[in-house]
Amino acid sequence: MDGMGEGPDGMGFDMPMLMNQQPHLFGGYSRDSSRGSPLNNVLSNPTYNEEPGMAGEDNNDAKRRRIARACDMCRKKKIKCDGKMPKCSHCINYRTDCVFTQVEKKRNPPKGAKYIEGLENRLGRMESLLRLSGLLSEDDGKTDLGTLEKRLADRSLGNTALNSLKSPTNKFNGSSATSQSQHTTASRHSTPRMDSHSSPHTAATSPNSPKESETEVEGLSDMMCSLVTNNCGETRYIGSSSGFSIFSPKGIQWVNEKTGDTSFQEMISSAYVDDNKWMYWKPEIFSDIFARRVFKPLPPKEEALSLFRDFFENFNCMFPLFHEPTFMHLVERQYSRDPYEGSGWWASINVVLAIAHRLRVMSNLVPQEEDKKAWLYLKNAMGVLTELTMRNTDLLSVQALLGMSLFLQGTPNPQPSFFLVAAAIRLSHSIGLHKRGSGFGLNPVEVEQRKRVFWIAYLLDKDICLRSGRPPVQDDDDMNVELPSEDPPDNIGNVPLSDGKGKFNLFRTLCRFATIESKVYKRLYSAKASKQSDGELLNTIGELDRELEEWKDSIPIDFRPEHEIKASHTPLILHVVVLHFSYYNCLTTIHRMSVHHGYWTSRLSNYAIQGLNARPLNPRVFLSAVLCVTAARASINLIKYIPHGDFACVWLILYYPVSALVTLFANILQNPNDARARSDVKLMNVVVNFLSTLVSDESNGSIKRMLGLCGEFERIAQVVLDKAEKESHSKKKRKAAPDEPQDLRQKTPDENSVPSPSTKRPTGAPPTATLFPSSSYPINLGNTGPDMSNPTRAFAPGQTVLGTNGVPTSMQESMHTMSGMGHDFPEMLSPNNMDSVGFGDQQPFGTPTETPMTSFQQPFVPQDLWQMPMTIEWDWADMSSNFPVFEGTPNTGP
């Protein structure tokens, strides 16, 4: 009968009544036995009941515990022990002592522990995907599988009800109608009921389209906002959170419905017609401040029209700051007997004249002295700056502030641009540029121009934010204005392709790029981002890198970064060059965080390689150091597109090549044995020569100081390379010496020993060596791959490997060799080619104890150098006392 329940019985019939019987474990103990130890069945042996008095003795429990294990002699002879007391039968026969040795059996982990751990990891990844798809809410731990199953059932039930309503001929069977009638009736008249802690309605949780509900909510929010315009054309925006939102269209409509007349609406309209606000506010105090000073009169009409034509054809076509028909209408009025007297218009027309003069100087159409006229027109605009910020609330004032900011970006001091952009964005909030404004009653031309002006302010704000490390003014969570039109009727922003068959909207592309810059700062460098865990930050770096690469791939090949620029028009080339510079800077800023935290040397690399992360990891995060250095090289190569001379446009992009020089300088000090170190020094020299061409007069002290600093960087890098080359030759000589004593060979740095802190440095080492520790560390000849047992040593950014000729090379050099990078920058940065970069041949190295940083915290660029400010006007007095200055001489000996 033992086989019953496991198959057919003797007559060939299945026995289903026994299939669900609980299996008998460990020898088939009876269900009727007493609760407790499973040995109770064995202890009911009548042998123990034959001995008198055994049941009542105090040592009865101890004797029973000993029977669970045979005596030592029976175990040694591997015979069955009957457990009799005081001696078992075999011990009596052999006349030996009957000894029971108590041995505690260690419990091993269950065999399925690893399997369960794998299931948990897979389940975690599934939950992460479900959260991304909207099936799970973000409340961790509150949504279990039962709740999820209920939601799916409700959704399925709702879909069934909708299908039944669509097909009236569909009828239920009699058997199913009784079991599903209640659910079907409820589904036909209401949407599926959600729990109180359920996620918001999405495509996965509600049969209704989420876009419709989102549109309704946004439309209601727009209706609760108000944009009031007075008789002067000035507007005033009031948001929905304000206590005065009752003056919004929705609020006025509500009052009209409750009162039954329009008296409230008429009173509000008449009140705003007489709105003067600042016009006569404290005239005895601010009259002299608001007085308009003219530093240079406007040019004659013909000359002005020529300048305006240059502005709209060469500048406004890419940066649509003004609507040309509206602007030219005001120009005609300006040169009539009834000019428009608004301060916003006065500042705007002078800003356009200033930018037009500067464009002519940049194109070598006029002498350099013409730039003085540009500054005089700018002074005219700056003369009404107080009135623009304290008094005006019109679109022309925002445009004038942005125009002044764009002009002053071509100066050594970026502080005015910071202030002007911030003022422009705050003023744009006053007139509601950051909102869609569907209920403002504006015509399509006005709506499009408002979008363009806002996005110019937005991209300037985000560019300043990323380069200076200062928080942005515009909050991305409190704006819903769409991107500019991709193909507008006036063709603004469109650039023809080289084949003549297509076009590309450069302005819209720059606006999309600004949104990525905003995410980079917010998710990597803001105060909130610093609270992320290492794993979250690593995933964020991969996501931002992927989004940046998708943006780059959307650009036509003629203007795409990492490719030659195919444009002949000088102003257009400058716009594309700025686009390329910005891309490389953003790429470096993303991966700088990975390099600084040493993610590719941490345990997270092993964690990701084993597939334990919940989301697929971008493999480029383990190439962050290579990407930063390669982007720096590409940035310096863009200098050839910049006009030579002391032009204002140079200040727009001077940050990028100087920042790239600092990156190459730090990489050379960290990896002096890099195969491209010599070529990197030549690139540093290109930057130095570029700066030297800008020193045109004695008054340009900013360029001179920058030139001196960059020249010192180049000299130190050259000294470090010469020193590393001499040390490499001396190492090879010591290796080649056959008669060298064994004890001396063990002291050479070519073995896998870690030098002690008391080891002396070479006398010729530069003083900066302590700040930038070199990574030409000894090679571990005993290993052939990364030491995964110590993941903090694997994948070090400055890792030394054994080259093909036996000379130690850096990890970056090995990556260049394996990927066939060379000058093929596009292939290097392509995500599809990441598989060609292998880590299997890398040799981990020992970190010297004399370095102040561990391998986990050892970026190839020190953190202080990453924080180089955007402004050139540094406090040079403080820098001269704090910045390390090289004073040593290289060691001429081996």
From Swiss-Prot:
GO biological process: DNA-templated transcription; positive regulation of metabolic process
Low complexity biased stretches: 175-189
Any one GO molecular-function label of the UniProt entry: zinc ion binding
GO cellular component: membrane; nucleus
Stored SUPFAM superfamilies: Zn2/Cys6 DNA-binding domain (SSF57701)
Biased composition (Polar residues): 159-174, 199-210, 751-761, 771-792
Domain of life per record: Eukaryota
Region listing for Disordered, in residue ranges: 159-219, 724-797
Record's keyword terms, sorted: DNA-binding, Membrane, Metal-binding, Nucleus, Transcription, Transcription regulation, Transmembrane, Transmembrane helix, Virulence, Zinc
Protein name: ABC-transporter-regulating transcription factor
